[in-house]
Amino acid sequence: PGFGESPAPEGFVPSIPAYAQALRDFLRAVGAEEAVLVGHSLGGAVATEAAEERTRGLVLLNAAPPSGLPTPEAYYPVLESYRQDRKAPERALEAMAPTQRPPWFPELVDCAQRMHPAHYQGNARALAHWRASRAYGGPVLVLYGTLDPLISREMAEATAAFFPKARLQVLEGVGHSLNLENPGLLKAILEGFLKEVAG
């Protein structure tokens, strides 16, 4: 809720459990009896929290670790300034995709600026306060780009160690956002994982 064209309910307070519930509600509404959940960054925390028995697999792409992701208090005013300064979110998104940006990158910046006002600081606070409530027991693929300025390799290793059936795939020369930097590689990785969990 509150991203892209999805409205946020009045009084919405960002939290990982609230986002996870919204994802589960969506899957039920579209009649998806089984799903492979793919989560990037904050979405990795959401997918981790949303995974349940009917989940066939989990792919975590430079995801926030199950122990949460603290943001230093001094950074919160900077996050709040993104609401007024168009260049600030653009610079932040550029840092998250250091090797390549798609032609539609300006549209991504526009979309980011339409985010619900509660999200600017709220998402960082949600990640700081979140701890995974349980470890999903099915197959998990943890993807980590070595140029990520936000998620460290140690965090990615801790994420993989948290799940009983996880493996870590390290991607050299990729930053935080493989989905932007090399979507073809991500597609191939996802197709391979889908074949594994379908077999």
Predicted feature locations:
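Conserved catalytic-core motifs of eukaryotic protein kinase domains, centered on the activation segment
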Residues: 6-12, 70-72, 153-154
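Catalytic nucleophile loop
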Residues: 39, 43-44
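Conserved serine/cysteine hydrolase catalytic core
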Residues: 121-161, 170
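Flexible "cap/lid" loop of the alpha/beta hydrolase fold
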Residues: 45-85
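Active-site loop/oxyanion-hole signature of alpha/beta-hydrolase fold enzymes
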Residues: 2-38, 188
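Conserved alpha/beta-hydrolase catalytic His-Asp/Glu region
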Residues: 69-74, 83-135
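Alpha/beta-hydrolase active-site loop signature
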Residues: 1-4, 65, 175-178
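Catalytic active-site module of serine/aspartate enzymes centered on a nucleophile-bearing elbow/loop
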Residues: 166-199
